């Protein structure tokens, strides 16, 4: 009778230890999932704000370039990717790339169109874009750091057992490079 009680207590103790262990690792996963979701929302908001700023820049550039017919002919090409986005749905990383190309295009236009770099509205918008770029860079670094830890938890024992029970999947870095596949074409610059 006494040995039966000891066995029952041992089983209860093992179950309790396992439950505490499971809850601890589960909560660790949840912590990183929440961090990742929050920073994704921050990146999304900043990308949308940057996109809106580029939509404000387009009419300003067109307005400051009215007299120049040579540049006027190029206007349909100015920020054409930004204009096309109005009718498309894309992911954050693709938007990030398009907006990065728009940054380069804005610098190029400032060099090509005389007086554009002196326009106060353009200066203000450029400052806001630079501020947003810093926020996005910091957020993507934080995102990738958390993804690294999350993916490490998925791979290491014993947290990989909890991940398998909860059906957690590996997440990609912000640049969408999948380090675990054989596809080398996803390493775009």
Where are these regions (language model features)?
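A helix-centric hydrophobic-segment signal that preferentially recognizes long
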Residues: 2-189
């Amino acid at each position: 009778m006494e040995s039966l009680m000891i066995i029952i207590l041992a089983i209860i103790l093992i179950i309790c230890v396992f439950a505490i262990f499971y809850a601890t690792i589960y909560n660790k996963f949840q912590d990183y999932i929440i961090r990742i979701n929050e920073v994704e929302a921050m990146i999304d908001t900043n990308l949308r704000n940057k996109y809106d700023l580029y939509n404000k820049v387009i009419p300003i550039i067109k307005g400051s370039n009215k007299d120049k017919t040579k540049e006027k002919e190029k206007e349909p090409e100015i920020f054409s990717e930004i204009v096309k986005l109005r009718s498309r749905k894309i992911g954050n990383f693709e938007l990030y790339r398009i907006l990065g190309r728009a940054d380069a295009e804005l610098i190029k236009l400032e060099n090509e169109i005389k007086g554009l770099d002196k326009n106060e509205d353009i200066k203000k918008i450029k400052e806001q874009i630079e501020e947003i770029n810093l926020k996005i860079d910091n957020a993507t670094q934080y995102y990738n750091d958390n993804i690294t830890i999350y993916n490490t938890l998925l791979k290491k024992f014993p947290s990989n057992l909890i991940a398998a029970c909860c059906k957690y999947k590996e997440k990609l870095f912000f640049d969408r490079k999948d380090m675990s596949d054989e596809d080398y074409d996803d390493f775009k610059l």
